[in-house]
């Protein structure tokens, strides 16, 4: 697991999975939304990951997060699953 922290306002966690990488979590406090913190953390993670395919799961109803991922080159691949934590529907985004 690899952890990135964003000035006590956010964090990103990623891990290598076979020949790709998974962004396991990306969170920021609402006060930091729109400040570029999420962009900076995601770009740093992608730089660390290098030239490998990357995937992540997002809550289907979280349109703000989905727009963020799409803005950064991720595309929904059509995969869906039910979250183990709260039963919410998640969709998979991929890049590369």
Tell where the protein language model's regions lie, with residue ranges.
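Accessory recognition modules or surfaces
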Residues: 35, 39, 88-96
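Conserved GNAT acetyl-CoA-binding A-motif
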Residues: 48-60
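Conserved catalytic-core motifs of GNAT/GCN5-like acyltransferases
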Residues: 55-58, 75-91
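Acetyl-CoA-dependent GNAT
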Residues: 1-33, 39-48
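Conserved active-site tyrosine of GNAT-family acetyltransferases
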Residues: 69, 74
């Amino acid at each position: 697991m690899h952890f990135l922290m964003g000035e006590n306002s956010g964090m990103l966690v990623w891990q290598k999975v076979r020949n790709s990488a998974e962004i396991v979590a990306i969170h920021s406090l609402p006060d930091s939304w729109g400040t570029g913190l999420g962009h900076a953390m995601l770009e740093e993670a992608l730089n660390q990951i290098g030239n490998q395919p990357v995937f992540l799961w997002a809550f289907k109803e979280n349109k703000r997060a989905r727009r963020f991922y799409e803005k950064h080159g991720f595309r929904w691949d059509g995969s869906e699953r039910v979250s183990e934590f709260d039963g919410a529907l998640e969709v998979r985004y991929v890049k590369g």
